[in-house]
Swiss-Prot record:
Name of the featured protein: Large ribosomal subunit protein uL4
Cross-referenced SUPFAM superfamilies: Ribosomal protein L4
Gene: rplD
A Pfam match: Ribosomal_L4
Coiled coil spans: none
Organism from which the protein derives: Pectobacterium carotovorum subsp. carotovorum (strain PC1)
């Protein structure tokens, strides 16, 4: 199959297995959920009644005081006591096979092509690391919410995009399923397309 280059009167021949396969919603969902789960920090920590600081002595005798019975100042009922079901550090990552991950990326890229959300260009760059230059370029292309993928990371482009809302710049090696579906449009250079094809082959 062929992808038309928007900035040139030509087309780029690409593999149908990467850019023309059926959309597997279940697979994409599973991989996106796993990717998001892996990004969770998981460092929350609370103390149980066994871990909080305090004496093990019974605060007052069982009977005769008129007060409610109590066995420990570390009881979860008490102020500064332990937490009943204390949260502990946790690894939320889920296992995803390479074949599944690649399949999900291919499925997303194919769907972007079908929905006309993938724009392929010969090259995409700015002369200097200036936000104004990139903003003007995107305005000319009628793009606002966009992910720009280049073959190698263009430092000028990366720096120019940092202060633009809903604009991100990645190199081909750094793409992930969440970023591909998060933006309204995806702009890829011809080099990036070839690199992604090789990566997912």
């Amino acid at each position: 199959m062929e992808l038309v280059l928007k900035d040139a009167q030509s087309a780029l021949t690409v593999s149908e297995t990467t850019f023309g396969r059926d959309f597997n919603e279940a697979l994409v969902h599973q991989v996106v959920v796993a990717y998001a789960a892996g990004a969770r920090q998981g460092t929350r920590a609370q103390k149980t009644r066994a871990e909080v600081t305090g004496s093990g002595k019974k605060p007052w005798r069982q009977k005769g005081t008129g007060r409610a019975r109590s066995g420990s100042i570390k009881s979860p009922i008490w102020r500064s006591g332990g937490v009943t079901f204390a949260a502990k550090p946790q690894d939320h990552s889920q296992k995803v096979n390479k074949k599944m991950y690649r399949g999900a990326l291919k499925s997303i890229l194919s769907e972007l092509v079908r929905q006309d959300r993938l724009i392929v260009v010969e090259k995409f760059s700015v002369e200097a690391p200036k936000t104004k230059l990139l903003a003007q370029k995107l305005k000319e292309m009628a793009l606002e919410d966009v992910l720009i993928i280049t073959g190698e990371l263009d430092e000028n482009l990366f720096l120019a995009a940092r202060n633009l809302y809903k604009v991100d710049v990645r190199d081909a090696a750094a793409i992930d399923p969440v970023s591909l579906i998060a933006f309204d449009k995806v702009v890829m250079t011809a080099d990036a397309v070839k690199q992604v094809e090789e990566m997912l082959a």
